[in-house]
Amino acid sequence: MADGIDRRADDKMEFNTSKEVTVAPTFEDMHLKESLLRGIYAYGYESPSAVQSRAIVQICKGRDTIAQAQSGTGKTATFSISALQVIDTVVRETQALVLSPTRELATQIQSVIMALGDYMNVQCHACIGGTNIGEDIRKLDYGQHVVSGTPGRVADMIRRRHLRTRHIKMLVLDEADELLNRGFREQIYDVYRYLPPATQVVVVSATLPYDVLDMTTKFMTDPVRVLVKRDELTLEGIKQYFIAVEKEEWKFDTLCDLYDTLTITQAVIFCNTRRKVDWLTDKMREANFTVSSMHGEMPQKERDSIMQDFRQGNSRVLISTDVWARGIDVQQVSLVINYDLPTNRENYIHRIGRSGRFGRKGVAINFVTSDDVRILRDIELYYSTQIDEMPMNVADLLS
């Protein structure tokens, strides 16, 4: 599993896919540039995952594409490889634009593109809010083949004419369900309006609710679809449990009781609001527990340093809002705790997908008050899954 994908689970994935989509069993069968193939193998990929073997060829043909697959199945590499195949590195202009809902995800995508394009002399810039605008302007004026960014900063740079759009061939919307949620919808339209009419659109996400699929009709032409059936979307290899806590006030004591279990590997604890993250972090520290925390209101430098500490394993328990839930890849995370159940059932799968990355075993524990029982049942029904009461030996499941 050097390439980080669980092949057994991958082989069992069911695809509900457009008829014209063929399967390319190897990267060589995709007729990719030699320099790109070298980068793919150097990155640790040996053969394409299920979603890669179906989607890359279609995207490289220039087809508008909707690709849906579980977390940890190589979705980021799917569009990164495709973008690197279609760009011409001789032309130092932006030719592919990737939009993501969080700064951390945009930065991670940039690092994947740089690694896969290592032998291509590719220029890729992360254009994200909370960073120095002067640096953005300098990098963009120099010329970037690929820009990976958040919608607000990208729209701003286009309006200021530092991000030149006339050579853009491909727009990728990653975690499209979140991007197209109300918060980013207008900014995406802002960006889209500036792109050449022939721009290819690629939509990628673990969940694609029907309203998102409906919205894509506005800016996609006859898209090819590579969709996993929803019944297949519960993340295999992740055991899901709940703890009945009756009252909100009891959650804190329950978490303290679990702390020794959390630190066996690394754990992420999700709360629904920034204020709750700050409150819980303070409470845990007052009780002499070591935790770190992150949410969208923190300065970007602080968020970067917290992410780096967590990635390197220097901090073991991270308390966060959903800013962390989407696509962030930290391979050691084996445990996710939903201190609050997510208000949006699509976010449930993004959160628990943080544990068990790339086919490792993971555990997700949901704190459920009497008010939450209905939400939990709704999640079970929506994903055709079963969430059991947590057993006493949860530590054994993690070790």
Curated annotation (Swiss-Prot):
Its EC number is 3.6.4.13. Its main location: nucleus. It comes from the Eukaryota. ATP binds at residues 69-76. It is found in: Nucleus, Nucleolus. It catalyses: ATP + H2O = ADP + phosphate + H(+). It is an enzyme of class 3 (hydrolase). The keyword Hydrolase applies. Keywords: ATP-binding, Helicase, Hydrolase, Nucleotide-binding, Nucleus, Ribosome biogenesis, RNA-binding, rRNA processing. A motif (Q motif) lies at residues 25-53. One of its GO terms (cellular component) is nucleolar chromatin. One of its GO terms (biological process) is mRNA splicing, via spliceosome. Residues 237-398 form the Helicase C-terminal domain. InterPro entries: DEAD/DEAH_box_helicase_dom, Helicase_ATP-bd, Helicase_C-like, P-loop_NTPase, RNA-helicase_DEAD-box_CS, RNA_helicase_DEAD_Q_motif. GO terms for molecular function: ATP binding; ATP hydrolysis activity; mRNA binding; RNA helicase activity. A motif (DEAD box) lies at residues 174-177. Residues 56-226 form the Helicase ATP-binding domain. Pfam families: DEAD, Helicase_C. The Q motif is unique to and characteristic of the DEAD box family of RNA helicases and controls ATP binding and hydrolysis. Belongs to the DEAD box helicase family. DDX48/FAL1 subfamily. ATP-dependent RNA helicase involved in 40S ribosomal subunit biogenesis. Required for the processing and cleavage of 35S pre-rRNA at sites A0, A1, and A2, leading to mature 18S rRNA. PANTHER family: ATP-DEPENDENT RNA HELICASE DBP3. This is ATP-dependent RNA helicase fal1. It comes from Emericella nidulans (strain FGSC A4 / ATCC 38163 / CBS 112.46 / NRRL 194 / M139) (Aspergillus nidulans). The gene is fal1.
